[in-house]
């Protein structure tokens, strides 16, 4: 214990006596003064700043590199990937410049460019946002706009979104302030009509108003460790100025508004009559979206102004869905093959089976999102039996299985070569039904 013969207590770290310092905190066989506590606090804060600075010192992926990374997980959507790559690169370049203290020649303040993703259900909006966050190694939080309401009403407060991001960052405020928030179903919070209403629209225009400041940049007060707010509580302050907000929605019916704008004036005897097959495709119409179209759809002008970057996604066709099943790093067929290999069983899909899965997803109009449910239904009985069977080496799925006309074929022998130490799931075996 740091105690002199005279009985006077001293700090175990700096050696100063109780009379020389403001406070002396006693521990087991040791003391620490308030000055040493301040020094320790400074050291911890400096260490945290260095860790945060590590992000700024890293090489920021260039747009081409971001696009290449997205290509590994997302099939198609070339224009959307290019738009996102540039927008995300510029956003984090802006952050990096601010962190390093770099000021442009004319001291121009670069505004934040949040992103609006417009595309059909299952076209890859959420996956794009998740992949970007994983690539940049930043916290990522997702929220459903349909659950949001204005503060004071039953439902989820918009500040809860930032709270989710803070939780994902393990309550590291510096880390959370560089994260990405994806708000899905943003098209569901449009105002009910273009005319002002006497009743309060707490889940439509009201939510847009509540999101305005959050998206643009404000200091949000978040209760610690996800607790509820109460007046005597200390809050965690989070600045949302550098958080990248990506909003996505299917915007069903928006294409009709764009089409009407293009056809305006084509009325009368000299109007050109278009055949049905000449009607512009959904993707082409989405690419021509203007802010006025979004206002007509029900988004308020101020909200649209906070989302200056608009990226549109195309509806996935059969070929794209087949690619999604086999080509990405985490392709669905590879995921199921990996599950089967844990039971020491090979899983083989005939090409006709993959085509049938893609066709079924198109019929359901669920895009890539519907592929997993189809696969689950097809393989349910097999996955139920497999752990109890030791006589199966290979499971073959053909077109008839997908159509519900047959059961998967079980074979005793393995069709894929295995490493004795490790299963390689990188290469999926796809065979043509003609050669089977």
Swiss-Prot record:
One of its GO terms (molecular function) is protein dimerization activity. The keyword Metal-binding applies. Gene3D superfamilies: 1.10.8.60, ClpX chaperone, C4-type zinc finger domain, P-loop containing nucleotide triphosphate hydrolases. InterPro entries: AAA+_ATPase, ATP-dep_Clp_protease_ClpX, ATPase_AAA_core, Clp_ATPase_C, Clp_protease_ATP-bd_su_ClpX, ClpX_bact, P-loop_NTPase, Znf_CppX_C4. The keyword Secreted does not apply. One of its GO terms (cellular component) is HslUV protease complex. Pfam families: AAA_2 (PF07724), ClpB_D2-small (PF10431), zf-C4_ClpX (PF06689). This is ATP-dependent Clp protease ATP-binding subunit ClpX. Residues 1-52 form the ClpX-type ZB domain. The lineage of its organism: Bacteria, Pseudomonadati, Pseudomonadota, Gammaproteobacteria, Moraxellales. It comes from Acinetobacter baylyi (strain ATCC 33305 / BD413 / ADP1). Residues 407-436 are annotated as: Disordered. SMART domains: AAA, ClpB_D2-small, zf-C4_ClpX. Zn(2+) binds at residues 11, 14, 33, 36. ATP-dependent specificity component of the Clp protease. It directs the protease to specific substrates. Can perform chaperone functions in the absence of ClpP. GO terms for biological process: cell division; proteolysis involved in protein catabolic process. Keywords: ATP-binding, Chaperone, Metal-binding, Nucleotide-binding, Zinc. PROSITE patterns: CLPX_ZB. Belongs to the ClpX chaperone family. ATP binds at residues 120-127. PANTHER family: ATP-DEPENDENT CLP PROTEASE ATP-BINDING SUBUNIT CLPX-LIKE, MITOCHONDRIAL, ATP-DEPENDENT CLP PROTEASE ATP-BINDING SUBUNIT CLPX-LIKE, MITOCHONDRIAL-RELATED. Component of the ClpX-ClpP complex. Forms a hexameric ring that, in the presence of ATP, binds to fourteen ClpP subunits assembled into a disk-like structure with a central cavity, resembling the structure of eukaryotic proteasomes.
